[in-house]
């Protein structure tokens, strides 16, 4: 929603250019700022419904300058809130998860991201199942420096906030066109955004979008995948004021796309996943 109106992101010639990377990263900063402040188990915390309000998104979008980085993205004040209701989050999320994307021969689509958190979870075994260590997805700091309650603070019976983002994109006829998702802890959001922009805006097929260099920002520096040759366009961002940092960004994107009645699959080369069909 935040990046849709920007022409600098649209079309094949925009692929991985500095202006496009900057706009995407700035939108991600704003999104993470709101997510970290407001998102938690809705059974315990009233999540603001106005986070996706068009007028609110318009105001947030005005904070994005195509060729300039913001110093720090602050959470907004969505409609219905008189003040920023929750404190500064202190959650640390471990990268580890599994993604399955399916379209069957009748056109039914399924995207599932599953996790037990770290590799082998808590390392405890019960009747053939490994138990998770999902408590690490909570903030263990219940209040911030100002004494304001943190939305994602740990509590009995509460579900931890997750970054999992299994995604199904529907076409104009309501039929699934893209089914995707990824493991990767709190960076899952960056990987899914990269894949969707790559396919929808830059015209990449499912495999090329999955293999595309990972990048983005969670509110801090602009992260660029260190396991691939660093893009010069990323270094251009320093002139915009972005602090560019090479990082380990091990995605596991699995995508199925419907193109002209044909299904194409893309499996992230960074992990063991494969694309298969009958």
What are these regions (language model features)?
Residues 21, 106, 157-160, 192, ...:
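Extended C-terminal subregions enriched in glycine
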Residues 262-278:
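Low-complexity, Gly/Ser/Thr/Pro-rich intrinsically disordered linker/tail segments
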């Amino acid at each position: 929603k935040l990046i849709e109106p920007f022409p600098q992101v649209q079309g094949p010639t925009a692929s991985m250019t500095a202006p496009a990377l900057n706009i995407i990263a700035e939108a991600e900063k704003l999104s993470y700022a709101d997510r970290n402040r407001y998102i938690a188990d809705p059974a315990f915390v009233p999540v603001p419904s106005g986070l996706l309000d068009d007028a609110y998104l318009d105001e947030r979008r005005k904070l994005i300058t195509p060729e300039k980085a913001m110093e720090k993205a602050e959470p907004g004040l969505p409609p219905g809130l008189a003040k920023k209701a929750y404190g500064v989050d202190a959650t640390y999320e471990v990268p580890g998860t599994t993604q399955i994307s399916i379209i069957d021969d009748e056109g039914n689509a399924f995207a599932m991201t599953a996790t037990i958190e770290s590799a082998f979870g808590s390392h405890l075994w019960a009747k053939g199942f490994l138990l998770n260590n999902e408590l690490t997805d909570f903030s263990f700091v219940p209040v911030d420096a100002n004494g304001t309650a943190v939305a994602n603070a740990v509590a009995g019976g509460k579900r931890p906030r997750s970054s999992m983002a299994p995604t199904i994109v529907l076409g104009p006829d309501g039929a699934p066109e893209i089914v995707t998702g990824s493991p990767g802890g709190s960076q899952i959001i960056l990987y899914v955004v990269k894949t969707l922009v790559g396919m929808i805006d830059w015209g990449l097929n499912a495999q090329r979008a999955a293999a595309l260099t990972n990048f983005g920002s969670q509110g801090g520096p602009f992260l660029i995948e260190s396991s691939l040759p660093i893009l010069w366009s990323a270094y251009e961002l320093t002139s915009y004021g972005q602090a560019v940092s090479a990082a380990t960004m091990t995605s596991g994107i699995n995508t199925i796309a419907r193109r002209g009645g044909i299904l194409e699959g893309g499996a992230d080369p960074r992990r063991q996943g494969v694309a298969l069909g009958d």
